[in-house]
């Protein structure tokens, strides 16, 4: 979702250098193929721990951080007046999927050197506690796999590759073949397999046309549409409009995602339709089968303790989320209110060694 705007701003931002982690680069290049009229760009690969010198006075270092997709990077901008840290979307996860945990010692070392300004993800700032580990999600999904008697139909975000990997791994454990549905998900899985970010045995993933060769209890379908999108796989399946996957009453449907604000009605209508059709339905309110990629209040506290910034600027979230995040700056670091900037889209914030305004 964050890289999708690039084709639309390319003609407005001059000719900057582009850097991205390997998976991000591959997904971006695939995205840009859909916009043949946009000018071609060259994206340089950057790895966690590497630093790019922009000028004599400016450089950018990136560190590994965890999210719902591999290759997430925290960005540290080194300036003459101090370090500016942007967390990106993040959570702390000791047991991530096909990824390494964030290096807390490296984060602390930057805190020891001094951080002038921290821009931190606020999406989970209204939720108390730690974000759920992907390990917990896999354990709960396995409960469903153990008891499912027919096909498993699992829906999630097309970019939630960690969840796709868990579903593939569990399918292999329980001797199920996997069918991928949804253009974005198919593309993302293909790219991730090529780069080694999704691991599957040679004959695990099959084409929909081969599904009839296996009994229902040996089939898992992973697709898009958990937000109730009208043209996505899950809605067409629920309405009996999907050519390749027709609904059956012994199907088990898994919503492995939370509901994005604004989609509540369409998701509820979709769930109601599935219940009316007689399938078994599991969603995140019944058991922990979805973990947000965004840290909750305890994750945010931990980042603040590690980096100990002079100034805090909550980012990414509704204003209410950023306001709750600001409270943590006061609570954890005893930060005065004037050292916290609550800005809205379009506002310009000026930072000096002594103040933020």
Where are these regions (language model features)?
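His/Asp/Glu-rich metal-coordinating catalytic cores
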Residues: 1-214, 232-246, 265-269
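C-terminal regulatory/interaction regions
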Residues: 169, 173, 192-357
């Amino acid at each position: 979702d964050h890289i999708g705007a690039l084709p639309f701003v390319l003609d407005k931002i001059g000719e900057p250098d582009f850097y991205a982690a390997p998976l991000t680069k591959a997904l971006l290049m695939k995205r840009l193929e859909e916009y043949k009229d946009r000018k071609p760009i060259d994206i340089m690969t950057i790895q966690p721990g590497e630093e790019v010198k922009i000028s004599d006075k400016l450089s950018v270092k990136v560190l590994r951080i965890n999210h719902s997709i591999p290759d997430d990077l925290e960005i540290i901008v080194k300036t003459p007046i101090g370090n500016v840290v942007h967390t990106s979307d993040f959570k702390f996860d000791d047991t991530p999927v096909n990824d390494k945990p964030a290096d807390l010692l490296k984060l602390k070392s930057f805190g020891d050197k001094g951080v002038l300004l921290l821009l931190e993800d606020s999406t989970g700032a209204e939720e108390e506690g730690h974000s759920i580990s992907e390990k917990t999600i896999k354990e709960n999904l396995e409960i469903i796999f153990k008891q499912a008697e027919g096909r498993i139909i699992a829906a999630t975000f097309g970019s939630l590759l960690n969840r796709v990997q868990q579903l593939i791994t569990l399918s292999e454990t329980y001797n199920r073949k996997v069918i991928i549905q949804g253009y974005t998900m198919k593309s993302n899985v293909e790219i991730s397999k090529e780069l080694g970010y999704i691991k599957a045995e040679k004959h695990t993933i099959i084409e929909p046309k081969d599904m009839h060769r296996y009994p229902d209890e040996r089939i898992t379908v992973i697709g898009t549409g958990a937000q109730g999108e009208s043209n996505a796989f899950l809605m067409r399946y629920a309405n009996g409009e999907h050519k390749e996957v027709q609904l059956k009453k012994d199907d088990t449907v898994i919503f492995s995602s939370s509901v994005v604000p604004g989609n509540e009605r369409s998701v509820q209508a979709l769930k109601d339709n599935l219940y009316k059709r007689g399938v078994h339905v599991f969603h995140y309110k019944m058991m922990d089968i979805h973990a947000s990629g965004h840290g909750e209040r305890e994750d945010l506290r931990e980042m603040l303790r590690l980096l100990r910034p002079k100034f805090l600027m909550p980012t990414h979230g509704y204003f209410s989320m950023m306001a709750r995040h600001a409270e943590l700056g006061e609570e954890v670091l005893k930060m005065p209110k004037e050292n916290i900037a609550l800005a809205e889209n379009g506002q310009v914030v000026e930072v000096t060694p002594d103040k933020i305004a």
